[in-house]
């Protein structure tokens, strides 16, 4: 397979500071060890311990948080990476693929991407995400955009309303209305590491968490060749120039992926499907015996020695055999995890290698664990059981509805900051106070320093723009400021903050 050279992809360069001159193996490894240190010690990773996996506001430490889930994904990602590299070694392809000095970085990039993959998720998971998008959609009317007004503009933000004869400005307004109405955890992760936390990670490390390749402002048809890669927003307008630099540095086509991202995605798929079921048993939603019946029902007719019998049946037959050493539930899930990982990891590695040219270029338009194989069927039945019997459980649904209300309520509470005239908000930022806006001043004081600094830095770069463009972009970064602050909260902090500000305690 000529043309595959991982030296073109695993770049040691960073967006800030002088270019790296690392050439020997240990120098290159040190670059990515620095990435590891920056990531592991970041506040975003620590906050994962109080963010929802499936069960919001969970007090039982045995039930997974985003952090414990991410640690499990990290381990599976490392395993897949090692499996791929071992097969390259067996086929004597290490040198041919430019990996002589990159074996440790290959693994490290995957591991750290797995650890980071959920850092952009807001409180209360997908329901928090939906709350942000629905709130901003009502404000923005993103589908009413265009180059010229068409009838009554339903946008509630005067700065972003379309105006006759302002074609270029209307295109910008429409783009920003789309962008702000499409908050997405993966795009927020890119924003976190680059704009908010300023971790200055290598382009390769950040490229590995660019899971989807569509900008959040996208409003046109999606090319069929990239309909999977572009099914969700992957980055915001605010980070567009950075993503362009990243693509140049990593030799990525416009809507293509970084090759190691496929491994991170497969590790997540393998990990969460088992974890959600184990947590459901821990929460007494169903017993192991009931879970087994649910899985048999989804699989259909089983035969002795088929994949279901080996993986799920094999685990079920271990029930009770470990008594005195561990509980029957622990026994079952230990074997289920071992059996599942033992089958799906080699399958993911094989799919990576079989499709290497497309994977390397980043144009492979599906997940590694998305084919007609029994391994993928097994993964799908795990997911179906979770959807049918876990996600719609009354306790889960009630907590998700509470989470939706909390995030929507916080956006309502902080919305006066978005309603301020540009000049007044600029004065508030500069002076940390505004006598005519006492409520807004107090709300502004509650915003975190790093988010306020990111806003100030972004608006500082707008000086060269026309007054009309400046006003539009200023509102954009102000809305981003509110999204950044609320999405960065933990579940418990968001819940407590909402109760405090609603005078409910």
Swiss-Prot record:
Its EC number is 3.1.5.1. The keyword Magnesium applies. GO terms for biological process: dGTP catabolic process. The keyword RNA-binding does not apply. CDD domains: HDc. It catalyses: dGTP + H2O = 2'-deoxyguanosine + triphosphate + H(+). One of its GO terms (molecular function) is magnesium ion binding. SUPFAM superfamilies: HD-domain/PDEase-like. dGTPase preferentially hydrolyzes dGTP over the other canonical NTPs. PANTHER family: DEOXYGUANOSINETRIPHOSPHATE TRIPHOSPHOHYDROLASE (PTHR11373:SF32), DEOXYNUCLEOSIDE TRIPHOSPHATE TRIPHOSPHOHYDROLASE (PTHR11373). Homotetramer. This is Deoxyguanosinetriphosphate triphosphohydrolase. The gene is dgt.
């Amino acid at each position: 397979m000529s043309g595959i050279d991982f030296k073109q992809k695993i770049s040691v360069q960073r967006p800030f500071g002088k270019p790296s001159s690392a050439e020997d193996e240990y120098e290159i490894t040190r670059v990515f060890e620095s990435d590891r240190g920056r990531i592991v010690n970041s506040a975003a990773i620590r906050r994962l311990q109080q963010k929802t996996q499936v069960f919001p506001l969970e007090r039982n430490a045995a039930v997974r948080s985003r952090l414990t889930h991410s640690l499990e994904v990290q381990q599976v990602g490392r395993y897949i990476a090692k499996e791929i590299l071992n097969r390259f070694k067996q086929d004597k392809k290490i040198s041919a693929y430019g990996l002589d000095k990159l074996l440790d970085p290959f693994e490290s990039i995957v591991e750290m991407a797995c650890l980071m993959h959920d850092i952009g998720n807001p409180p209360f998971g997908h329901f928090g995400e939906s709350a942000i998008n629905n709130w901003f959609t009502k404000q923005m009317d993103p589908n009413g955009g265009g180059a010229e007004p068409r009838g009554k503009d339903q946008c509630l933000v005067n700065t972003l309303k379309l105006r006759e004869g302002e074609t270029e400005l209307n295109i910008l307004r429409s783009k920003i209305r789309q962008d702000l109405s499409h908050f997405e955890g993966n795009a927020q992760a890119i924003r976190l590491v680059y704009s908010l936390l300023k971790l200055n990670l290598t382009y390769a490390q950040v490229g590995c968490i660019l899971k989807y390749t569509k900008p959040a402002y996208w409003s046109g048809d999606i090319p069929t060749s990239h309909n999977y890669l572009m099914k969700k927003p992957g980055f915001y307008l605010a980070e567009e120039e950075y993503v362009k630099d990243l693509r140049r540095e990593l030799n990525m086509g416009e809507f293509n992926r970084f090759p190691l991202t496929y491994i991170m995605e497969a590790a997540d798929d393998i990990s969460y499907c088992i974890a959600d079921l184990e947590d459901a048993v821990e929460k007494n939603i169903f017993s192991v015996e009931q879970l087994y019946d649910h899985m048999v029902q989804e699989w259909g007719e089983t035969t002795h020695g088929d994949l279901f019998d080996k993986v799920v049946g094999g685990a079920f037959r271990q029930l009770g055999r470990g008594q005195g050493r561990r509980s029957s539930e622990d026994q079952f899930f230990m074997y289920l995890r071992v059996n599942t990982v033992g089958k799906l990891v080699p399958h993911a590695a094989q799919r990576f290698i079989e499709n290497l040219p497309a994977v390397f270029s980043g144009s492979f338009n599906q997940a590694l664990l998305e084919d007609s194989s029994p391994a993928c069927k097994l993964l799908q039945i795990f997911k179906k059981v979770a959807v049918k019997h876990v996600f719609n459980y009354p306790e889960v649904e009630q907590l998700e509805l509470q989470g939706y209300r909390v995030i929507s309520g916080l956006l309502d509470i902080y919305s006066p900051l978005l309603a301020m005239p540009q000049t007044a908000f600029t004065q508030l930022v500069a002076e940390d106070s505004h006598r005519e806006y006492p409520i807004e001043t107090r709300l502004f004081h509650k915003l975190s320093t790093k988010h306020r600094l990111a806003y100030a830095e972004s608006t500082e770069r707008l000086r060269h723009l026309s007054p009309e463009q400046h006003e539009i972009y200023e509102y954009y970064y102000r809305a981003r400021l509110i999204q950044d602050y609320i999405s960065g909260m933990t579940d418990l902090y968001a819940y407590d903050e909402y109760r405090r500000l609603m005078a409910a305690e």
